[in-house]
UniProtKB/Swiss-Prot annotation:
Source superkingdom: Bacteria
Keyword tRNA-binding attributed: no
Keyword terms: Glycosyltransferase, Lipid A biosynthesis, Lipid biosynthesis, Lipid metabolism, Transferase
Reactions mediated catalytically: a lipid X + a UDP-2-N,3-O-bis[(3R)-3-hydroxyacyl]-alpha-D-glucosamine = a lipid A disaccharide + UDP + H(+)
Protein name: Lipid-A-disaccharide synthase
InterPro entries hit by this protein: Glyco_trans_19 (IPR003835)
NCBIfam families recorded: lpxB
GO biological process per UniProt: lipid A biosynthetic process
Enzyme Commission numbers on file: 2.4.1.182
Gene Ontology cellular component annotations, sorted alphabetically: membrane
Family from the record: Belongs to the LpxB family.
Gene: lpxB
Known pathway: Bacterial outer membrane biogenesis; LPS lipid A biosynthesis
Lineage, broadest ranks: Bacteria, Pseudomonadati, Pseudomonadota, Gammaproteobacteria, Pasteurellales
Any one Gene Ontology molecular-function term assigned to this protein's record: lipid-A-disaccharide synthase activity
């Protein structure tokens, strides 16, 4: 490797990966001003100077049906990327998330003497744990957002570095509620519940009804309570509004385009689907209840595949039931309202418990606030310069 101008390959498959890639390139350029960056990039990575071999949108395929439909094209792209990388011989290949695409590329490149890093651990600790053996063969190192992920890899002697979470870097330890209310143009003197029904159509389909009925029950208990409903895009908004028209036509809601983070900061509590949103709510210091429903067969299979005691990231990080998880038959309006009312009550013990929970959230935030972009770049530098054992 030329110490001053390495060739660094990065492949991102979606918007979140493009954001990570751009942050990583920015940090690497500070150390290697003359480095060349190639791969599959989105607009943010392109703006940082990455040469893209394929439009990132070509890899952004969601859902089994979509994947099957586009499989021949995806396989062709993967074959071309492998061929190009074997010709270019980059000093390191960094697969950013997109494990179904990147791990096969990494496997081939590592076998041909190219250093590989997989950035963002797949949820191998939760399900399909046998993937750990493929990851071990494919990568010189995994970069993990969360400490329990590194602990899992350590058990299998797979090189892994905990770098902290980029979201923990982006959200302040003490979020500014007044500023969030101003952004949303809502009255900070009011009491709010944020309702996040998920970003996927299937989540809205299964969660909108119980979440709306929960809001109705809470409105009876807390007449001054108002509801903030951020929706990820126009498609989800239309879907949600159609369900609301049938279930709760007279319930007043503040429908918001995007801005989920500001809604959670402004709210006194949050009702949400599991996933990254639960981590974001924790970082926003919003007491939450996690609710999730899916098709009975999907749930039957998931129960047998998932190997963790909890499904939400705050509970997984704490390794205890910090926030209620109401799954499948427990995801009812009555139970959700009961759990949320504890956060919304003005009762002295409820207020005290709320403060204790927020302190737990702050402690967990500090644990994963490590300047992830810089940590990721240092891991790449260590691998390139031979200071990391591989």
């Amino acid at each position: 490797m030329n110490k001053t101008n390495p060739t660094i390959a990065l492949v991102a498959g979606e918007v979140s990966g493009d954001i990570l890639g751009a942050g990583l390139i920015r940090q690497l350029k500070a150390h290697y001003p003359n480095a060349r960056f190639i791969g599959i990039a989105g607009p943010r990575m392109l703006a940082e100077g990455c040469e893209t071999l394929v439009d990132m949108e070509e890899l952004s395929v969601m859902g089994l049906a979509e994947i099957l439909k586009h499989l021949p094209r995806l396989l062709k792209i993967r074959k071309n990327i492998i061929q190009t990388m074997l010709q270019e011989k980059p000093d390191v290949y960094i697969g950013i998330d997109a494990p179904d695409f990147n791990l096969d590329v990494e496997l081939k490149l590592k076998a041909n003497g190219i250093k590989t890093i997989h950035y963002v651990s797949p949820s191998v600790w939760a399900w399909r744990q046998n993937r750990i053996h493929k990851i071990a063969k494919a990568t010189h190192q995994v970069l993990a957002f969360l400490p329990f992920e590194k602990a899992f890899y350590d058990k299998f002697n797979v090189p892994c570095r905990f770098i902290g979470h980029t979201m923990a870097d982006a959200i302040p330890l003490k979020p500014n509620r007044a500023e969030a209310c101003q952004t949303l143009q809502i009255d900070p003197a009011q009491r709010y519940l944020a309702i996040l029904v998920g970003s996927r159509g299937s989540e809205v389909e299964f969660l909108a009804e119980p979440f709306l009925k929960t809001a109705l029950l809470l409105k009876e208990q807390f007449p001054d309570l108002q509801f903030l409903v951020p929706l990820v895009n126009e498609k989800r908004r239309i879907q949600f509004e159609a369900i609301k028209a049938k279930i709760t036509p007279n319930l007043d809601l503040h429908l918001i385009d995007g801005n989920a983070r500001q809604a959670m900061i402004a709210a006194d509590a949050t009702l949400l689907a599991s996933g990254t949103a639960a981590l974001e709510a924790m970082l926003c210091k919003s007491p939450m209840v996690v609710g999730y429903r899916m098709k009975p067969l999907t749930y039957f299979l998931a129960k047998r595949l998932v190997k963790t005691d909890y499904i939400s990231l705050p509970n997984l990080l704490a390794n205890e039931m910090l926030v209620p998880e109401m799954i499948q038959e427990e995801c009812t309006p009555e139970l959700l309202a009961e759990k949320l009312s504890v956060y919304l009550s003005d009762d002295e013990s409820a207020v005290k418990n709320r403060h204790v929970l927020i302190q737990h959230f702050t402690d967990l935030h500090q644990k994963i606030q490590c300047n992830a972009d810089k940590q990721a770049a240092q891991a790449v530098i260590d691998l390139l310069e031979g200071t990391e054992n591989v």
